[in-house]
C-alpha cells in the first residue's frame, strides 16, 4: 500500500524565553541529520524522501522541546525535562526524573547542528544532573525531583513513599551515553569535560547498577547484590545493548562484554521458554529456581510486572539498535519474532496496537492505543526488508499522532525512535565517528 505525504518545512527552533541569547559558539561535529550507515539489509520508510524523514524529526523535536524542556525557575544555567506536565506521575509536585533527563540529554546531543542552542540545553541539563546526585554515588543522578511550595526543586525525600534520592539504571545509562555523544559532538576541551564525566558515570554504573555475580543490570544503585527479591532481578527496558558496547569501548573494560553476554542470554531464555510465539519480554525478570523467569505480580510496580507493559514497551526500540549499529545477531530472532507477531496480531494496522500484552499475546488493555508502544515496533520493523509496507504504515501512524494528544512518556519515546528510524542514531565510540 502506497502513501503520499505533503511534508511541511519544519520551523526553525525558537528560544525558550524571549530575549534568550545562545552562548554556544562551538560548532557541532556531527550535525543533524547524521545519516548513519546502518547494518546492510535494514530498511527505512521508503514512501517519503530522506529529507522528509529528517523534516518530520525536526518538527516533532520542536514540539517536544517547547512542551517539555524547561529552564530551572531559580537557576538560569540549568534545564530539566518536565515529565509531569500531564500530571501522570506521583507525587503531584513531581517535575523531573532521571529517565526523562537522560532522554533530554540524548535528544539535545543528537539534534545539535539543527538547533543552534542544543549545546546550551545540553550543558544546562548536565548542570541539573550534577546538582541532583544520587545519595549512593555522585556520578549517578537521583531518580526524581519535586518542586516545593517555595519554588525550589529538590530530590523527592526518603520520607515519601518513593525515595527519589537514589538512582535508576535507565536514566544512568542514557546520561552516560549522552555524555559520550557530547564529547564527539563538541569536544571535551571546554568548561565541561564530557568524556571524563561520561567515563565516571560508566564506572559508577558498573560499580552500583551491575550485579557482578551474574553480570546482570539491577534496577538502580539502591539494590544490594544479596537482596533476596531484587538482587538478581532485572528490567528488560534497560537492555540497551548498544550502550553496553559503547561503555566497554569508552572505558576499555572487558566486563561490559560480560554484561552484554548475560543480557543477550536473558533475552534468549525468556523468549524461548516463556514467549515462544511472540518473543515478548516482560516489564521485570527475576532469578527463580536456577534460571531467569518473568516477574511475579507486584514485584516493583503493579500486577502487570510480569507482562509486556509500560516498561517493556521500550524493548522493541532498545534491543534492535545494537543490530542496526553493530550487526550483532544475537537478538535478531527474538526481534523478528516479536515484529512478525505484532504485525499479524494487528493485521498491519498500528492503531490496533494496545497498551500491553501478556507474554502469550493476549491484550491487557483493549481499545487503548499508545504511541509508546507503536513507535518502538517501528524500530524493530527496520531489521527485515519484508517489513517494508508495515514500517511505512507505522511511520505514517507515529508522525501523524498529535503531540498534544500524547504524554511526556510517549512523546519522548516517539521522538527518540524517529531519530533512529530516520537514520540519525549513532555510536560515539565507533572509530568512523
Located regions from the model:
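Alpha-helical support elements that line or immediately flank enzyme active sites
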Residues: 105-114, 381
Amino acid at each position: 500500500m502506497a502513501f503520499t505525504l505533503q511534508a511541511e518545512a519544519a520551523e526553525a527552533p525558537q528560544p525558550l524565553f524571549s530575549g534568550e541569547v545562545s552562548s554556544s559558539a562551538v560548532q557541532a561535529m556531527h550535525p543533524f541529520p547524521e545519516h548513519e550507515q546502518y547494518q546492510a539489509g535494514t530498511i527505512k520508510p521508503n514512501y517519503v524522501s530522506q529529507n522528509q524523514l529528517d523534516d518530520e524529526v525536526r518538527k516533532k523535536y520542536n514540539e517536544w522541546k517547547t512542551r517539555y524542556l524547561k529552564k530551572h525557575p531559580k537557576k538560569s544555567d540549568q534545564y530539566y525535562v518536565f515529565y509531569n506536565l500531564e500530571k501522570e506521575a506521583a507525587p503531584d509536585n513531581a517535575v523531573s526524573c532521571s529517565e526523562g533527563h537522560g532522554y533530554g540529554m540524548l535528544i539535545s546531543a543528537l539534534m545539535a547542528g539543527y538547533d543552534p542552542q542544543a549545546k546550551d540545553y545540553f550543558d544546562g541539563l548536565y548542570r541539573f544532573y550534577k546538582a541532583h546526585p544520587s545519595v549512593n554515588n555522585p556520578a549517578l543522578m537521583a531518580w526524581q525531583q519535586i518542586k516545593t511550595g517555595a519554588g525550589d526543586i529538590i530530590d523527592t525525600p526518603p520520607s515519601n513513599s518513593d525515595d527519589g534520592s537514589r538512582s535508576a539504571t535507565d536514566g544512568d545509562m542514557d546520561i552516560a551515553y549522552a555524555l559520550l555523544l557530547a564529547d564527539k559532538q563538541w569536544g571535551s576541551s571546554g568548561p565541561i569535560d564530557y568524556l571524563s564525566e561520561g567515563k565516571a558515570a560508566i564506572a559508577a554504573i558498573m560499580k552500583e547498577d551491575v550485579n557482578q555475580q551474574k553480570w546482570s543490570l539491577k534496577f538502580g544503585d539502591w539494590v544490594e547484590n544479596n537482596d533476596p527479591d531484587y538482587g538478581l532481578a532485572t528490567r528488560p527496558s534497560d537492555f540497551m545493548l548498544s550502550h553496553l558496547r559503547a561503555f566497554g569501548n569508552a572505558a576499555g573494560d572487558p566486563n561490559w562484554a560480560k554484561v552484554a553476554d548475560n543480557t543477550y542470554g536473558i533475552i534468549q531464555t525468556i523468549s524461548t521458554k516463556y514467549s515462544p510465539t511472540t518473543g515478548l519480554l516482560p516489564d521485570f525478570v527475576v532469578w527463580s529456581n536456577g534460571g531467569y523467569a518473568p516477574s511475579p505480580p507486584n514485584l516493583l510496580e503493579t500486577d502487570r510486572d510480569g507482562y509486556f507493559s509500560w516498561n517493556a514497551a521500550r524493548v522493541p526500540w532498545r534491543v534492535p539498535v545494537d543490530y542496526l549499529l553493530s550487526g550483532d545477531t544475537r537478538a535478531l530472532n527474538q526481534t523478528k519474532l516479536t515484529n512478525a507477531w505484532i504485525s499479524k496480531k494487528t493485521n498491519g494496522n498500528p492503531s490496533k496496537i494496545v497498551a500491553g500484552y501478556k507474554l502469550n499475546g493476549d491484550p491487557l488493555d483493549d481499545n487503548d492505543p499508545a504511541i509508546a508502544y507503536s513507535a518502538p515496533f517501528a524500530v524493530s520493523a527496520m531489521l527485515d526488508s519484508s517489513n517494508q509496507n508495515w514500517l511505512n504504515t507505522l511511520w505514517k501512524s507515529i508522525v501523524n499522532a498529535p503531540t498534544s494528544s500524547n504524554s511526556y512518556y510517549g512523546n519522548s519515546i516517539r521522538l527518540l525512535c524517529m531519530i533512529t528510524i530516520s537514520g540519525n542514531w549513532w555510536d560515539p565510540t565507533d572509530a568512523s565517528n
